[in-house]
Amino acid sequence: MAGEDRVEQESSVPADVREKHALLAEQIEEHRFRYYVKDQPVVSDADFDRQLRSLEALEEEHPSLRTPDSPTQKVAGPYRTEFTSVEHRERMLSLDNAFDDEELAAWADRVAKDVGTPDHHFLCELKVDGLAVNLTYEHGRLTRAATRGDGRTGEDITPNVRTIAEIPHRLKGEDIPALVEIRGEVFFPMEDFEELNARLVAADDKPFANPRNAAAGSLRQKDPKVTATRPLHMVVHGIGAHEGLSIDRLSAAYDLLHTWGLPTARHNKVVDSLAGVREFIAHYGENRHSVEHEIDGVVVKLDEIPLQGRLGSTSRAPRWAIAWKYAPEEVNTKLVNIRVGVGRTGRVTPYAQVEPVEVAGSEVEFATLHNQNVVKAKGVLIGDTVVIRKAGEVIPEILGPVVDLRDGTEKAFEMPTHCPECGTELRPMKEADIDLRCPNARTCPAQLRERVFYLAGRKSLDIDHFGYVAAAALTRPLEPAEPVLKDESDLFSLTVEQLLPIRAYVLDQDSGLPKRDPKTGEEKIATVFANQQGEPKKNAVAMLEGIAAAKDAPLARVLTGLSIRHVGPVAAQELARQFRSIERIDEATEEELAAADGVGPTIAASVKQWFAEDWHREIVRKWREAGVRMADEGSDEDEGPRPLEGLTVVVTGTLAGHTRDGAKEALQALGAKVAGSVSKKTAFVVVGDNPGSKYDKAMQLKVPVLDEDGFAILLEQGPERAKEAALPVPEAAPAADPENSGE
């Protein structure tokens, strides 16, 4: 009877009073949450008390509004996530996978056959590598968030999900359905992952093995205040149960989610054929690291919702969708050892030797660890099972250990005190430096090998057929006993007769260790430059021709190749432009160097320190005698116009008419600064094929974007005409589309 009385009493409360009560209750709950969980109150205590008293007054006047769920009946205090089991109104299904084109084509054929009409489309989405979450909105208000669980039942994580800034507590706009379940993926950005693990290790807590585990662990905190400190993000990619919502196309549904204020992604595409699907998959296979989160594949869905219903589902997955999986970029393997390598400037860097494993389509045996502090911050021990990641062309890296698999035999890494190749005691260059360095720059074989390899490389003299094996053979051969190159000064005096007798280990570029024969396990040794008849190999002849051609290299490339600390291609370009010859750079005071545009005191000091060494001067002397051009032609007055002086330009994508380096050099020659990221200070963004996220950022910031024709106008006619040729900027950002985890 009491329940019936309450219903009768509630029905007697005017609608506007009930609405005012509901709004006040929601606002008070939100203020409590911001105060106790996020430590970000947006109202004063007095304003909060005033709202609470208003709610109490309404309930005093209308007692039927005073329910156990009312803020007036609950004690305010710390929130706690209990992880109680909750049932999804509509099942969260998984997805079937396609690992090759044959499986993808077979699925597309089945779809075409079952829908019975050629008039259908595919919606291609990126597959986010995160944790699947189901959001329930009732009358536009977020009432529950739950994990996927077994698809039918998940865990209630509402207080934790409410800490994610991107997830609206109330949907925007009109025509909000009475009920809607929103499916999406919570992820942990890679750039924040290492920082979190370092904090955990410093606090003697277990580190996470990878960003996905970090996202899951962050959502499973009993105290939402902890979750609130984690930089979690979400993208939505589907709709579950709903009332009062009618829509025919999934792509249109995503546009609707965006208008409601939900975090959707921008990389989806509707195509009308399998060829379009393949093109989308290929594009993001090459550009998967240009998006703002980790992806491990592409989800392909039938876009027409009525046709989805016709195809139905199996017990675990819809027949109208499939997940194309890229080769995995994260795998588990054993950390066999931690070694150290010596770079061209003497920096000693730890690296991981792991049991060989296939990652992202290639075999990996070594991974970077940067420095001893990173080893400590990652919490890895020799003997650990670790998660290794290889992202595109990036050097493989260790993400973290799988702590639960430790058996007690693991041991900590200790940084060596002496150089592993020359035995010199290691020390930091300055007292506060993290890195240890080998100070034996002249005779340390590792430093010489790395400097010579860099000198011949694409950023420096760009000598054909002069790779890592050649650099190692010339600087530390097995035969003859003495190296042909004792330092860089010998480079331009090399002869074919010197090359022929050289035998050396075939070294691995990642580790500096000899490669091994896969059949015998023995270290590989080769006669590097001569064939079996004792005649010079074609690559040896080509290498000597490349060395001769490098004598005419621009001054900037010569400066880059000298491995002066802090002088990379950009600084070398500025030094060459402003001083014109190596003699004038040598003669300039530190103050004169520091005053030059783009140089500054750090580079200036490093340049003067380099020229203070007699053996460095000997390199310059012998190169000059060999005919190396040590000055750019012309005087300062002859330099020519610099119409792009002071402008910052970003180049992205593949240009048909220029290499990336060629485009940069053309811009720098006209005075432009070439940057790697887009900001409000960017003057132009030059885009080729597959430009990635920099194009999107430029459009968002309304930075002029030039295609190849526009780039030619910029170089030939200047910035004002180039602005006229810029690609049109949309009035508003394109409608966002969601990512998909393929639960």
UniProtKB/Swiss-Prot annotation:
Residues 725-743 have a biased composition (Low complexity). Zn(2+) binds at C419, C422, C438, C444. It catalyses: NAD(+) + (deoxyribonucleotide)n-3'-hydroxyl + 5'-phospho-(deoxyribonucleotide)m = (deoxyribonucleotide)n+m + AMP + beta-nicotinamide D-nucleotide. Its EC number is 6.5.1.2. GO terms for cellular component: cytosol. Residues 639-728 form the BRCT domain. It comes from the Bacteria. NAD(+) binds at D45, A46, D47, F48, D49, S94, L95, E125, R148, E185, K301, K325. Keywords: DNA damage, DNA repair, DNA replication, Ligase, Magnesium, Manganese, Metal-binding, NAD, Zinc. This is DNA ligase 2. DNA ligase that catalyzes the formation of phosphodiester linkages between 5'-phosphoryl and 3'-hydroxyl groups in double-stranded DNA using NAD as a coenzyme and as the energy source for the reaction. It is essential for DNA replication and repair of damaged DNA. The active site is at K127. One of its GO terms (biological process) is DNA repair. Belongs to the NAD-dependent DNA ligase family. LigA subfamily. Its cofactor is Mg(2+); Mn(2+). The gene is ligA2. InterPro entries: BRCT_dom, BRCT_dom_sf, DisA/LigA_HHH, DNA_ligase, DNA_ligase_AS, DNA_ligase_CS, DNAligase_adenylation, DNAligase_N. Pfam families: BRCT, DNA_ligase_aden, DNA_ligase_OB, DNA_ligase_ZBD, HHH_2. Residues 720-743 are annotated as: Disordered. GO terms for molecular function: DNA ligase (NAD+) activity; metal ion binding. CDD domains: BRCT_DNA_ligase_like (cd17748), LIGANc (cd00114). It is an enzyme of class 6 (ligase).
